[in-house]
Amino acid sequence: MQEQSPELYEEVKLFRNAREREKYDNMADLYAIINTIQQLEKAYIRDCITPQEYTAACSKYLVQYKVAFKQVQCDEFPSVETFVKKFRLDCPAALERIREDRPITIRDDKGNTSKCIAEIVSLFITIMDKLRLQINTMDALQPDVKDLADNMNRLSLIPEDFDAKLKVEKWLGSLNEMQASDELSEGQVRQFLFDLESAYADFNKLLHSQ
């Protein structure tokens, strides 16, 4: 029996250094997000998820797509279409959603409403992620919470007495009373995160009702 060459058992590396590894990781992230949006569109068409679940998930993934594509965009991939073609991704529904930059459940008003909704979704996710990572100083949280409150006030479909908006404004008021280096206690972080998760769920319900 002929012996196998030892070279056949050597590990094949896709990258030669940390920079190349980061490049491949970024491309893998973008590939996964585009594929996820494609599968989400199929799930919605087949009534596998509710419109509320779809709207929330799609808004989130469109925000993540923008961040991921910026990490990959270069001369080789000037557009998402070139990336999709290069890696032979079959994702027409995802590309349509990316071009429209809004869930199919949200009506188009020349991008004003959809842009504001995307900002709100992005800020909810950003603030909740910070709290989960124990980033709890006033100067790290207040700018994002202020932007969230401003965007919620700007979105005309949100009522003045909307509970989710009032919760965000309450926490903004609390942060405004703190010094820049002051930290939220463990109990405050837990309550803040609970209030944000509740507010985010209520916001998604409101989108579904439109």
From Swiss-Prot:
Q: Which InterPro entries match?
A: ESCRT_assembly_dom (IPR037202), Vps28 (IPR007143), VPS28_C (IPR017899), VPS28_C_sf (IPR037206), VPS28_N (IPR017898), VPS28_N_sf (IPR038358)
One Pfam match: VPS28
Which biological process, per GO, is one annotated for this protein?
autophagosome maturation
Enumerate the spans annotated as VPS28 N-terminal domain.
1-108
**How does inactivating the gene affect the organism?**
Death at the transition from the first to second instar. Morphological changes in MVBs and developmental defects in the compound eye. However, for the ligands and receptors tested, changes in their cell surface levels or their delivery to lysosomes have not been detected. In early embryos and during sperm individualization defects in actin cytoskeleton organization ocurr.
Where is the protein localized? Endosome
Q: Where is the VPS28 C-terminal domain positioned along the sequence?
A: 112-208
Return one GO MF term: protein-containing complex binding
Q: Which GO terms describe its cellular component?
A: ESCRT I complex
Q: Which terms are listed as keywords in the entry?
A: Endosome, Protein transport, Transport
Protein origin, superkingdom:
Eukaryota
Give the record's family classification: Belongs to the VPS28 family.
Q: Cross-referenced PANTHER family, in alphabetical order? A: VACUOLAR PROTEIN SORTING 28, ISOFORM 2 VPS28, VACUOLAR PROTEIN SORTING-ASSOCIATED PROTEIN 28 HOMOLOG
Known partners and oligomeric status: Component of the ESCRT-I complex (endosomal sorting complex required for transport I).
Known role: Component of the ESCRT-I complex, a regulator of vesicular trafficking process.
Name of the protein described by the UniProt record: Vacuolar protein sorting-associated protein 28 homolog
Name the source organism.
Drosophila melanogaster
